[in-house]
Amino acid sequence: MELSWETKSAIILITVTFGLVYAWRVLNWMWLKPKKIEKLLREQGLQGNPYRLLLGDAKDYFVMQKKVQSKPMNLSDDIAPRVAPYIHHAVQTHGKKSFIWFGMKPWVILNEPEQIREVFNKMSEFPKVQYKFMKLITRGLVKLEGEKWSKHRRIINPAFHMEKLKIMTPTFLKSCNDLISNWEKMLSSNGSCEMDVWPSLQSLTSDVIARSSFGSSYEEGRKVFQLQIEQGELIMKNLMKSLIPLWRFLPTADHRKINENEKQIETTLKNIINKREKAIKAGEATENDLLGLLLESNHREIKEHGNVKNMGLSLEEVVGECRLFHVAGQETTSDLLVWTMVLLSRYPDWQERARKEVLEIFGNEKPDFDGLNKLKIMAMILYEVLRLYPPVTGVARKVENDIKLGDLTLYAGMEVYMPIVLIHHDCELWGDDAKIFNPERFSGGISKATNGRFSYFPFGAGPRICIGQNFSLLEAKMAMALILKNFSFELSQTYAHAPSVVLSVQPQHGAHVILRKIKT
C-alpha cells in the first residue's frame, strides 16, 4: 500500500527534526559548550589558547612532548620544561592563572597552595578523573570514590601500618642483598665498573614488591608485574590516539596485545588469590605479606558485619588491589632510587655525609627497621629528591558541581590540574635555590621547609594520600644504606640527562654510573 502524501510528509518532518536535534546536540557538545566555558574562564582573568575543535591543545601537547624527548637536556635539575613541557609552556606564556584544552575539556592550572590544599581535602567535590585507558594499569583504591573508596581504604590500611612494615624489613633486606651481590659480580679486577643502574633498580623494586605482596607465590607475582610494565608502555605509546572516539575498540596489534596481557594478568592473580583462600580455609597460618594481610583484614571486615560477604572485597576487587600494589610499590620507589643515585653522584659531599651516617648507625651490622628510622640525613636527601623529581608531574581532578575555589568560580564537568613539579620548583615558594639540590632545607622537617605552606606533596595529600608512601621510603632507605655501605659512585661520561614521563618520571636513556667497591 502506497503511503499518503501526508504520511510521507510526517515521516520526513520527524526525520528532519530528529536530525536537527542530533546535529544541535553534537554542535553543542563539540563547539558551543567548550566556547561558553572558555568565555566564563576568561571573564575571571584566566588565560589560555582559544578552543580548537575536538582535540583542543592535545596535538600541540604531544608534539611538544615528542620534541623535548628527542634529545637530552643539560645536567640540571630544572626538569619541568622537559617532563611537563606543555604545562610549563602554558604557565610561562599565560601566567599562573591559566588553562589548557585537553580534548574538549579545559584544565584549569592551579598554582596557589591553598587552592590545591582545598582540592585535595574535598575529595567528594573534586573526584579523580577517570581515564578509560588507565583502568588497564591502575585498579582498586586509586580509582574509587565515596563509600566504596572508604571501605577499600579501611580494609587495606592495616597492611601498610608501620608495625606490619617492620615485619617486612627482612624481605627488603634479602632483595637488596641480592642487588649488592649482582653488582659485585660485575666489578673488574680493580674493584670498579661502569653500568646502567636503572634496570637493576627496577628489578630490585619489582623483586621487593613481588616478595612483599605474594610471599610464596613470588615468581608468579613477578611475571604479573612484568606484564603490567608492558601494559604501561603500550598505553603510553597509544595515549594521543586514545583521545579519538572509539579508537580503543579498533583491532590493532597493540590493542590485541593489551587484551592478551590483561587476560593473563587477571587469570594469574585469581589463581594466586584462590590458592591463598583455600589455605586459609584449611586452617593454615596467614602469610605476613601484603596479600595475606589484605585477606586477613577482608575476612575480619566480613565477620564484623555478620558474615555478609558483600561487606568485604570480592575476588575481582582483591585482584584490583593486588595490581595497585605494583604501581604504588614499584614505580615510585625505583624512580626515587635512580634519581637519588644520580644526584648523589653529582653531589659527592652529600654522598659522603649519607655514607658516614649509615656507617655510624649500622657499622658492620645489617640495616634494620629501627636503625633505618634514625637516618636523618638520608631522610633529608630522599625528601629533596622527591621535591626535584616527583614520581608524577601533576594530578587532575574533576569538578563535580559548580563551586567557588578561592577567587575562582569553577563549573561542573571542568577539570583542575595541580602541577606538582611546577609547585615543587617555584622560587616564590622555595626561594632562589628552588631548582638546586639542597637537602639541608629539610633539616627541620617538611613543615619547616615549606614554612607551613602547602607546597610539597610528592605522594599526593588529603584523605587520598598515597597509602604506600611509608613502604616506599622504608625500601629506599634500606637500598641506599646497603649501596652506600658497599660502593661509592659517580656519573659516567656516557650518562645522558633525560628525565622523561612513562607513567612516572624516569631516566629516558638510563643512569650510567661508575661504581667503586668500598674496601672494608
Curated annotation (Swiss-Prot):
Topology in the lipid bilayer is annotated as:
Single-pass membrane protein
One of the Pfam families matching this protein, by short name: p450
Q: Which UniProt keywords apply?
A: Heme, Iron, Membrane, Metal-binding, Monooxygenase, Oxidoreductase, Transmembrane, Transmembrane helix
Is Transmembrane a UniProt keyword of this protein? yes
Which annotated residues bind heme?
Answer: C466
A cellular component annotation (GO) from this entry: membrane
| UniProt-recorded Gene Ontology molecular function terms | heme binding; iron ion binding; monooxygenase activity; oxidoreductase activity, acting on paired donors, with incorporation or reduction of molecular oxygen, NAD(P)H as one donor, and incorporation of one atom of oxygen
The membrane-spanning stretches of this chain are 11-31
Q: Which domain of life is it from?
A: Eukaryota
| E.C. number | 1.14.14.-
Q: Which cysteines are joined by disulfide bonds?
A: none
Q: Which major enzyme category is it?
A: oxidoreductase
**What biological processes does GO assign it?**
saponin biosynthetic process
Cofactors demanded by this protein = heme
Which reactions is this enzyme annotated as catalysing? oleanolate + 3 reduced [NADPH--hemoprotein reductase] + 3 O2 = gypsogenate + 3 oxidized [NADPH--hemoprotein reductase] + 4 H2O + 4 H(+)
Q: Where in the cell is it found?
A: Membrane
Q: Which Gene3D superfamilies match?
A: Cytochrome P450
Q: What does this protein do?
A: Involved in the hemolytic saponin biosynthetic pathway.
What's this protein's family per the entry? Belongs to the cytochrome P450 family.
Concerning PANTHER family, the annotation shows: CYTOCHROME P450 72A11-RELATED, CYTOCHROME P450 FAMILY MEMBER
Name by which UniProt lists this protein: Cytochrome P450 72A68
Gene name for this UniProt entry: CYP72A68
